[in-house]
């Protein structure tokens, strides 16, 4: 929301190191309740942010969009389509501006923020897409096959 952006801009200029609650809703990071519970009890999770950090994130996102056409390497962009933590639409905008021959976009309509820590019906296609992209990219670059944890568990190359 615009009021949040204005508040964080003011903070970054007048109180850049003041830590305030970020207001992110942990209940919406994953459909898997165990993941949410682990997140809530993790002492390393920071529940506050500074105006300086907010400005850095905002400016970094804008710069990424401005310079998307300069993407120098093959990239797999995997997006949670129902993400309430970050604006998924920004990823779509980035993909539209990046060189099409270098960027592969995979969009998961019902996924929340933690696409690799979702329930199986949601995360299975995520891991399958990653496995496929890594194999295709390794083959194109004449590299030996790469096994992700999900491919190793399945016993597939």
Regions found by a protein language model. Give the residues of each.
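Alpha/beta-hydrolase-fold enzymes
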Residues: 1-50
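Acidic catalytic loop of the alpha/beta-hydrolase fold
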Residues: 46-47, 54, 82-86
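Active-site nucleophile elbow and catalytic-triad environment of alpha/beta-hydrolase enzymes
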Residues: 49-67
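Conserved strand-to-helix beginnings and helix N-cap segments that scaffold or border functional pockets
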Residues: 51, 87-91, 119-120, 127
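Short beta-strand/loop motif that positions the catalytic acidic residue
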Residues: 71, 77-79, 83
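Short alpha-helix in the alpha/beta-hydrolase fold that links the catalytic acid
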Residues: 73, 87-97
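Catalytic active-site module of serine/aspartate enzymes centered on a nucleophile-bearing elbow/loop
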Residues: 104-157
């Amino acid at each position: 929301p615009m009021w949040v952006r204005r508040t964080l801009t003011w903070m970054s200029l007048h109180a850049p190191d003041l830590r305030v609650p970020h207001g992110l809703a942990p209940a919406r990071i994953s459909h898997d309740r165990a993941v949410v519970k682990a997140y809530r009890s993790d002492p390393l999770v920071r529940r506050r942010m500074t105006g300086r950090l907010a400005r850095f994130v905002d400016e970094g996102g804008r710069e990424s969009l401005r310079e998307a056409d300069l993407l120098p390497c093959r990239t797999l962009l995997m997006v949670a389509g129902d993400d309430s933590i970050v604006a998924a639409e920004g990823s779509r905008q980035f993909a539209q501006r990046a060189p099409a021959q270098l960027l592969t976009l995979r969009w998961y309509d019902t996924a929340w923020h933690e696409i690799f820590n979702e329930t199986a019906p949601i995360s299975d296609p995520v891991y399958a897409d990653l496995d496929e992209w890594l194999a295709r990219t390794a083959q194109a670059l004449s590299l030996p096959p790469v096994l992700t944890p999900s491919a190793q568990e399945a016993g597939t190359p």
